[in-house]
UniProtKB/Swiss-Prot annotation:
Protein role: Part of the ABC transporter complex PhnCDE involved in phosphonates import. Responsible for energy coupling to the transport system.
GO CC term (a single one): plasma membrane
Protein topology in the membrane: Peripheral membrane protein
Domain of life the protein comes from: Bacteria
Protein EC: 7.3.2.2
Catalytic activity: phosphonate(out) + ATP + H2O = phosphonate(in) + ADP + phosphate + H(+)
Protein name: Phosphonates import ATP-binding protein PhnC
Signal sequence, start to end: none
Organism, scientific name: Fusobacterium nucleatum subsp. nucleatum (strain ATCC 25586 / DSM 15643 / BCRC 10681 / CIP 101130 / JCM 8532 / KCTC 2640 / LMG 13131 / VPI 4355)
Amino acid sequence: METIIEVKNLVKNYGDKQILKNISFNINKGEIISIIGESGAGKSTLMRCLNGLEGINSGSIKFYDTDITKLKEKEKNSIKKQMAYVFQDLNIIDNMYVIENVLVPFLNRKNFIQVLFNQFSKQEYERALYCLEKVGISKLAYTKAKYLSGGEKQRVAIARSLAPNVDLILADEPISSLDEKNSTQIMEIFKRINIKKNKTIILNLHNVEIAKKFSDKILALKNGEIFFYKKSAEVNEDDIRKVYQTS
């Protein structure tokens, strides 16, 4: 299988505190990977490093065959256009229509005048509507985002991540504020995207049972280190207990 992410000996510090310690793992194209662990284990930091939002102190992160940690900012931005990041706080703009929120990624490809006057092409609008249809909220395209529920806003964020037709989607705690029903629906959307479009998806999740149900593999972090990285079907109750066990 083709490797899309290769991490070797990654170290990340904040000042004198080491957040990630000698992290190494591979992710194959088309896999769903869930990252689990206690709060403060380094999950969100790892996600941001993988996307290039955070620099690292040592080690390497390869996207396909390119080490993104050695790129200049312009080159890094070109690579990041092949990735989408669903932030924990979603970054949905309440006073914009749903479809306008989904169109936001296309702004990076436009000049100042086009951005100023929201000049989007017919193809971009069609792509945005297509993505909203895939997450089941195309009827809300011309609704102001401030009127949406939490679950609907999460769907908008996922649709926005699909709009640029990227290879890799990273979602930081995409279901943390949702009830069980909405959490399952959101994970089913990720699974459909994964199966039908062969997208690689990396998720930061607190719900271990949902992680096991919808992921191909689970990467468990503990105190900034990899505690285990294995197929979801191989993860047992003892593994989970040890991840969340305090010494």
